[in-house]
Amino acid sequence: MFALPVLALALAGCEREPESRGESASTERTRPNILLIVADDLGYSDIGPFGGEIATPTLDQLAKEGLQLTNFHVLPSCSPTRSVLLSGMDNHRAGLGTMGELKTPEMEGHPGYAGYLNFEVAALPEVLRAGGYHTYMTGKWHLGHSEETIPHARGFEETFILVPGGGSHWSDLKPVSPTQTMMYRRNGKVVEALPEDFYSTRYYTDTMLQFIERNHEDGKPFFAYLSYTAPHDPLHAPREYIDKYKGKYNEGWDVLRAVRLQRLKDLGIIGKDVEPFPRLASVKAWDDMSDDERLNAARDMEVYAAMVDYMDEQIKRVFDYLKEIGEYDNTMIIFISDNGANGALPTAYPGQTDEYLRSFDNSLDNRGLPNSYVETGPGWAQASMSPSRMFKAFTAEGGIKAPFLVKPPGRLADGGTMNHSLFHVRDIMPTILDLAGINHSEEFNGRKVRPMQGRSVLGLFEGKVKLPYKEASQVGYELFGLKAFFDGDWKILWMPPPFGPGDWELFNLKQDPGEVADLSAQHPEKLKEMVGLWEQYKADNGVLDISLDLSDKVK
């Protein structure tokens, strides 16, 4: 199935022109386009196909046309997931054993902890471009900020990107903390100022449409990486979209979580008897909050919903354009979130100060508008991740379980179906290359590169098989010293107090996706077996014994 080799040093740049433009067009048009859409900190149950009440008609329709994977897993935070997504290998091999902002002296000298997408991997856009694809990116990068590590240097030919992990969604260029820099780049060059009417989600979409339009008549297929920063904090949305959800969340996070839990059961995504992980002790019951606390919290969730709603509308613009130019049916479309919903507070960001946070106008009427800085917090994050334990940053299910929708080129005979098999982000790149007919070589651009650990599941995406390859059911995790390992329906989890017991726990996720009942005492041999598998994972991937104290990041 792999037809085109990735050319080594002489042809790695893929600048060679075809002998005949007409011949190229007729040949290349048979090759599918790839549209990869990533939402930022979107919760598992936020969108309609996964039980959400937020208006997402575009994604609802995508689920009806394609395949919905209900057991898809990513990494606990942004850049580690993106490193796996664009490399097909474990984050420790790809350079994001930790986030760049959280790198410690002990990690220096270890390529797996470089803090950027390292050069031991051939990145997905590099491989696709060498194989004859246009490669476009708009939105969040977060995989390196130097001239050598930005996307324009890693295979993308046209880019408009946010370099760091987050910041204001408006034109004011305000970072998430005063020690960080809000930077955009266009085709590698720093953008000094944004248009006054800039709003991130719209601008990323506008720019991506310009990129696709510019070359669509040349006959070459394209890879478009649309990497939205919605709904990452600070939460910002146009007022009319916020107003659309006014009063929607006045009953609070406990009610919302229960409603979404029931919808997940009704949709057949989880079993009828599933119990959710309890509300965190640090999260107030809604009825115990003051009137002002409830008003502010409800407004914050209204803004969050508005961001997701607006993103869905912008995705529709892309789909409509692809239909207009006759490319929709020839495009594989993948939609994911990069991690679980964010339950951390703004104080979690490195370099944060009270003085900086006080500089914003977070009055009720201005929340979500320019010069505000609000977040959902752990209460709403638990609702967004119903029925899971914890949220972003944790190796519990709430940090690593994400929505996944895919529409292969053409039409699925049984579109609108669900698949409950364990599927991991490491398998996306191999699947895309399989679809494109491109080999992954052991040498790229004059350097030796590691082979991908993930494998193609194209047959699953195309509805030809019901299960991915056998080894797909075994996946290891480590980030910030938090650990996990999957073996089919079984999972072991290690988290320190106060988030866990500081020892391994064992869960059967098919019966208990909320990770409520630790079965380690009942199944000691299974626990021992899986701890051994995790130790092998650690050795194979160069995992260091370094932990990060998260106790002051989540209250």
What feature does the model see in each segment?
Residues 147-155, 236-237, 320-411:
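Histidine-centered active-site microenvironments of extracellular/periplasmic hydrolases
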Residues 11-13:
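C-terminal motif of bacterial Sec signal peptides marking the signal peptidase cleavage site
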Residues 15-32, 39, 43-44, 68, ...:
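Long, internal low-complexity/basic segments
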Residues 21-67, 130, 141, 340, ...:
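Active-site-proximal N-terminal segment of extracellular/periplasmic enzymes that hydrolyze or transfer
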